[in-house]
Each structure stands twice: as structure tokens, then as C-alpha cells.
Amino acid sequence: DMMESWKVANILHKHHLCDPTAAWSEIPQMLFEGNAKIANRYFKKPLGILKVGAAADVIVIDYDPLTPMDASNCNSHLLFGVNGSMVQTTVCNGEILMKDRELLVCDEKKIMADCRQAAGELSEDING
């Protein structure tokens, strides 16, 4: 969950440096620019940008802010107002994987049932 990672990184830097202003701009830069630079070293399609020929990885978040949101406070809204459970739609490499919180590319119920069965078997193996 990228948003939770952002929150943790934000708190860790402030705590470590005893500075409430620390890492305010660095964390989103690491997440949105740094991650793309690293990934672009290893993948052939451009990542971290919306343009023709790029991977087209996008999420749509259901977020209705209580206060005005603009370019000057967007990071604050993302950091304090958004979490991963608000993701409604996910597009990866141009393919819609989840729309309106419904997975389109796999059988979620079967996967969950298989996981529950495997977890039960593991618990039985561990606990006897």
C-alpha cells in the first residue's frame, strides 16, 4: 500500500531527526519519481508517466475532500486523506484489473477459499 508506506516514511524521518518539517517534499519525490527511475532501469516500457507507449499503470481513488484541494496542497491530501482501501479502479499496462472494486482478471472467491484452506492446513501443521 503505497499510501501507508508514505505515511510511515513521513513519520520515521520526522521522528529520527526530531524535526516536524523533515522529509516533507522528499518522500513524495522518492515515491513518484525515485521509484519510476529505479523501475525504468529494469523494464522496457516507460513507467511512472502517462504518455503513448508507457505502461499505463493508473489507480482511481474515491476521495471527496472536506477542504479544497489544489496543486499547493495535493501532497497533504494524499498523505492525510487517502488510503489504499479507497482505490476503486486499477489499470496495469493499459488493462483494467479492477473496476468499481471488482477484480476482473481472476476468481477472487476461489483464491480466497484456497487461501483459507491453505491457512487452515498450515495452522494445523504448526499447532498439531
Predicted feature locations:
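His/Asp/Glu-enriched, well-ordered alpha-helical/loop segment
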Residues: 1-65, 79-83
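Secondary-structure transition/capping residues
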Residues: 17-20, 38, 46, 89, ...
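Alpha-helical structural signal
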Residues: 32-35, 88, 108
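Residues within well-formed alpha-helices
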Residues: 8, 34, 93, 114-118
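Glycine-rich loops and low-complexity Gly/Arg-rich segments
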Residues: 12-17, 83-87, 114-117, 122-124
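C-terminal cap of metal-dependent C-N hydrolases
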Residues: 55-105, 112
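Intein/HINT protein-splicing elements and their conserved insertion hotspots or analogous self-processing inserts
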Residues: 101-128
